[in-house]
UniProtKB/Swiss-Prot annotation:
It is a multi-pass membrane protein. One of its GO terms (molecular function) is oxidoreductase activity, acting on NAD(P)H, heme protein as acceptor. Pfam families: COX15-CtaA (PF02628). This is Heme A synthase. It comes from Jannaschia sp. (strain CCS1). It is found in: Cell membrane. GO terms for biological process: heme A biosynthetic process. The keyword Oxidoreductase applies. Heme binds at residues 289, 349. Catalyzes the conversion of heme O to heme A by two successive hydroxylations of the methyl group at C8. The first hydroxylation forms heme I, the second hydroxylation results in an unstable dihydroxymethyl group, which spontaneously dehydrates, resulting in the formyl group of heme A. The lineage of its organism: Bacteria, Pseudomonadati, Pseudomonadota, Alphaproteobacteria, Rhodobacterales.
Length: 379
């Protein structure tokens, strides 16, 4: 009969697995850091693209290139004959015939370079994404579960290029002076969707998955829910802002808080059928942009007051900055309207939307995944 064996018998040293202290976590940490830096680069590039797009619209340059050539369009006109051909194509548009008739080649080049620059930066952004994505895959730097997220950013970027041409094409139709406002809203909304996803990914990658799982147990669901509602309302406000920009609604009704001496603008529902007023009536569109701004302020203040009761200092500070930016963005919007939407205020107001939605996402993230805090830090 075999001898008895203690259940506490030690395993011989030769049987023990080789220890690799911290090896796996270090590799995962490096991968998360690399992906995070990559997305940060893309985030900055998208912010620049939104600014270029805004200036392209404000300079009325968006219809200067009348064809969509994703590859060959990267090369601009190289001689006088090529420039004349581009100008001749632009002369066929309603915008030229009704607004820019007689435009010189030198004047045309200014608006052409704005639109070409906007498209070229988009191409560059696509190349950076593709090279970075392939490089991260080749070096096995992508953490588990993140390949699909990175691929999603690329797919949305490609879809954004298609949406951009879909928008421009609407402005090239006979009788159109500008792009369709609802298509502009789709184009801008998609840009902010991409930007928001990138911001959220950057926040998540800044901490280990295990830490996030632990932090979520201590999260404030009600406060995170308030931030989520504020995020959705801000997204709606950005879309309405795009409609305002698309029909130049910000240049009319420059009094505040009233509109032409009343709370609602005159002829608010003058266009038939009624729903077209929501897209085409400058007074109606601006009215809803104002009202949504007021609602944002109320909900934002409520979220800030709720955050003041949080024991987490970092969470409270995040909502402080969000509230400051929300107030600043509203003031900036009022100034933009009262000055009849000059280009420099309009572009700053658009950039303010980028900052605001990023700060809302950060506040939501810290409400959902609070940072660890000592008793002394909470005092």
């Amino acid at each position: 009969m075999a001898g008895s064996r203690s259940i506490f018998e030690e395993v011989q040293d030769s049987q023990k697995p080789a220890a690799m202290p911290g090896g796996v976590s270090r590799d995962r940490g490096r991968g998360r850091a690399r992906v995070r830096v990559f997305i940060m680069i893309l985030f900055v590039m998208v912010v620049v693209q939104i600014a270029i797009g805004g200036l392209t619209r404000l300079t009325d340059s968006g219809l200067s290139i009348t064809e969509w050539a994703p590859i060959t369009g990267a090369i601009p006109p190289l001689d006088e004959a090529a420039w004349e051909a581009e100008l001749e194509a632009y002369r066929a548009t309603t915008e030229y015939q009704e607004q820019n008739r007689g435009m010189s080649l030198a004047e045309f080049k200014v608006i052409y370079w704005w639109e070409w620059g906007h498209r070229q930066w988009a191409r560059f952004l696509g190349v950076v994404w593709a090279v970075g994505f392939v490089g991260l895959l080749a070096t096995k730097s992508v953490p588990v579960g993140w390949t699909g997220r990175l691929l999603l950013l690329g797919v949305l970027g490609g879809l954004q290029g298609v949406a951009g041409w879909w928008m421009v094409h609407s402005g090239l139709a006979p009788g159109m002076f500008d792009v369709a406002s609802y298509r502009l809203a789709v184009h801008l909304g998609l840009a902010f969707l991409i930007l928001g996803l990138m911001a959220w990914y950057i926040l998540r990658l800044g901490r280990a998955e295990a830490e996030l799982m632990t932090a979520r147990r201590d999260g404030d669901r009600m406060l995170a829910g308030m931030a989520t509602g504020l995020l959705h309302l801000t997204a709606l406000q950005i879309l309405i802002g795009a409609l305002v920009a698309g029909i130049d609604a910000g240049r009319n009704y420059i009094d505040w808080p009233l509109m032409a001496g009343a709370f609602t603008p005159p002829d608010m529902w003058a266009i038939e059928p009624w729903y077209r007023n929501l897209f085409e009536n400058d007074g109606t569109v601006q009215f809803f942009h104002r009202v949504t701004g007021y609602l944002l302020f109320v909900i934002g203040v409520a979220a800030w007051i709720m955050a003041r009761r949080s024991a987490r200092t970092a969470t409270k500070r995040a909502f402080d900055w969000m509230a400051v930016m929300l107030f600043g963005q509203i003031v900036l919007g009022i100034m933009t309207v009262m000055h009849s939407s000059p280009w420099y205020l309009a572009i700053v107001h658009q950039f303010g939307a980028v900052v605001l939605i990023t700060l809302i996402l950060r506040a939501r993230f810290l409400a959902r995944y609070p940072l660890p805090q000592s008793v002394r830090g909470a005092a």
